[in-house]
């Protein structure tokens, strides 16, 4: 019997889900929402599209700081999502990105839910970064890769060799899209209009107006110009969810009806994304994303570092800001030895869905270690841990590596790992 294969990237903001033969994944909110104007209904997952008035939404999210902390809520969201798909779990298998799977100390009942509650036939668990690194290795024939994943809950940087994670190279920054939206809400509420409850609207405002400055000091000088001479300043007209359903960006010089709620964004447009490069701006004592890339590379054996620097792949929704890739490349270049080459890949068409598409190509072209129901019943977590540790390599194991082909021969069960 041929099984339907589902690829499921379980993100903190949006889930990316689709069958292996889909052209692109569906983006489904990974949250439950209560709207102020709807007294008797909650909107679960894709039902949020049916919510006509998105002012003052209250969110319940199963994922906090990048990990699932409320499995009951997550199960409810998954049930609604799977129910909207034209597939039967009993004749399907699912590849799931699951960050809890990477941390043995955290509760992870995803396999139990997928097997026992939904009844999937086979399950494969991995991470979004691993999908991208494996794709780079097996499909693009790149031996080394640095994956920068700037998502909703965090930004992580990890180095890989032959598709295997170098464990010491993982760097986490506690800044993602959620923190940036919350900070923009704070700044606008303090300076202009109280938008503390308008998470949905301000998140869209951030997406529509913010960009990464290539020179922060010069951008600040420009932002100090007088109101009418300031080319950075833009007006964002708030949606009313009757005639307009997304905010509209206008130049401040254009005439505007003062009765229509609007906000002005000037320095905020580039100061918000700047937090990704300088978290200390909001008192987070961590390095920025460029320094994290350098630190990740430096945690790897010296013989691998030039190849790592030549294949940096950027994914995640928070990397979609205009100028992000160029700024990252410029800052990393300034910190790398002059003899190293550098390539921050520009082949990523959509950073938000790139890991899903990598999984799609990998599952089509490669063997992966699926766990079936029988194996799960017999071995459970021990089987998952075994598969997980086969995808890791310690830096000490790579010391003395002279070329990648030698290391490739030493990689355990490479053709079976994902």
Curated annotation (Swiss-Prot):
GO CC terms, sorted: cytoplasm; cytoskeleton; Swr1 complex
Major localization class: cytoplasm
Domain of life assignment: Eukaryota
SUPFAM superfamilies the UniProt entry points to: Actin-like ATPase domain
Subcellular location: Cytoplasm, Cytoskeleton
SMART domains: ACTIN
Pfam families per record: Actin
Keywords recorded for this protein, A-Z: Cytoplasm, Cytoskeleton
Record-level Gene Ontology MF annotations: nucleosome binding
Gene3D superfamilies to which the protein is assigned, alphabetical: 3.30.420.40, Actin, Chain A, domain 4 (3.90.640.10)
UniProt keyword Transferase, yes or no: no
Keyword Cytoplasm: yes
Family per record: Belongs to the actin family. ARP6 subfamily.
Protein name: Actin-like protein C08B11.6
Natural source organism: Caenorhabditis elegans
